[in-house]
Curated annotation (Swiss-Prot):
One of its GO terms (molecular function) is rRNA (cytosine-N4-)-methyltransferase activity. Belongs to the methyltransferase superfamily. RsmH family. S-adenosyl-L-methionine binds at residues 30-32, 49, 76, 97, 104. InterPro entries: RsmH, SAM-dep_MeTrfase_MraW_recog, SAM-dependent_MTases_sf. It comes from Mesomycoplasma hyopneumoniae (strain 232). This is Ribosomal RNA small subunit methyltransferase H.
Length: 296
């Protein structure tokens, strides 16, 4: 069962307007969207996901609750195209949860988990060609080193890349796990689980996650108005750094007007999971919610 992270904090922070317009750019299993639908009456919700399985599983639950909803299969970086086609100019609240969902992690066939043996896949969108299998079996040594350094921050990037080249073809997640265990000393892995970082790096590359996030953040301001909010939940420092910079850039851009009008156009708040949530949902440990508010 997928438990949405920071749900209480997100819903309270959004201060949902019953007549408002909301966009969930990462539907997943619908935890955040279902909570929003319960609070909007004459409003509207548009949801996106690039994982067709997530849409198929969640669509019946959403439509059983309300009909004022649009469900779109797409990477979130293209959200502007769909909103413009729907004639939508402004949005009261955006929700983006950048985590991998529990059903994705728990299904060995998806290849996201290093604790379950399965095919090397890791595609959020199963219709795309690029998969973990292609990355690990076809990328040249230099490219593998780059993604392990850049997306995994792994000091053993060169050694892992060399071992991958020498062990091809790799077919399963456990083959990759065992390879990493042979390369990185056991005492090092006890202190820091670099296997997690290896899987993270490959997943980011397969799904073009950071580039998509950057494109999304560049497009968001166009759809904001006074009172609009953007809630983004991050799970690792790479994506959080990108979100933080984008929000701070908007805040700093407005410095002159702030001194003239006495009210910043944008402000930011940060929320972390409470102790009771961490106890019931260990996967929330690394989660962080950043909220951007347009004040005027």
């Amino acid at each position: 069962m997928h438990v949405p992270v920071l749900l209480e904090e997100l819903i309270l922070a959004l201060e949902i307007n019953p007549k408002g317009f909301y966009v969930d750019l990462t539907l997943g299993r619908g935890g955040h969207s279902l909570a929003i639908l319960e609070k909007i009456s004459n409003g509207k919700l548009v949801v996106f996901d690039k994982d067709q399985d997530a849409l198929d599983q969640t669509r019946p639950k959403l439509l059983a609750l309300k009909q004022n909803i649009e469900i779109i299969w797409s990477d979130f970086s293209r959200f502007d195209f769909y909103l413009e086609n729907l004639g939508i100019q402004f949005v009261d609240g955006f929700i983006i949860d950048l985590g991998v969902s529990s059903p994705q992690i728990d299904d060995p066939a998806r290849g996201f988990s290093y604790s379950k043996d399965g095919n090397l896949d890791m595609r959020m969108d199963k219709s795309q060609k690029l998969s973990a299998f292609i990355v690990l079996n076809e990328y040249p040594y230099e490219k593998l080193v780059e993604i392990f350094f850049k997306y995994g921050q792994i000091p053993y990037a060169r050694e892992i890349a060399r071992a991958i080249i020498n062990s091809r073809p790799l077919k399963t997640t456990f083959e990759l796990v065992n390879l990493v265990k042979k390369v990185i000393p056991a005492l090092v892995l006890v202190k820091k689980n670099f296997i997690k970082n290896v899987f993270q790096a490959v997943r980011i590359e397969v799904n073009n996650e950071l580039d998509s996030l950057q494109k999304l953040l560049e497009k968001l301001p166009k759809f904001l108005k006074q009172g609009s909010k953007v809630a983004i939940i991050t799970f690792h420092s790479l994506e959080d750094r990108i979100v933080k910079k984008a929000f701070l850039d908007l805040i700093r851009k407005d410095k002159l007007e702030f001194f003239q009008k006495g009210l910043p156009k944008f402000s930011m708040k940060v929320f972390r999971p409470k102790a009771n949530e961490l106890k019931s949902n260990p996967r929330a440990k690394s989660a962080k919610l950043r909220l951007l508010l347009q004040n005027r």
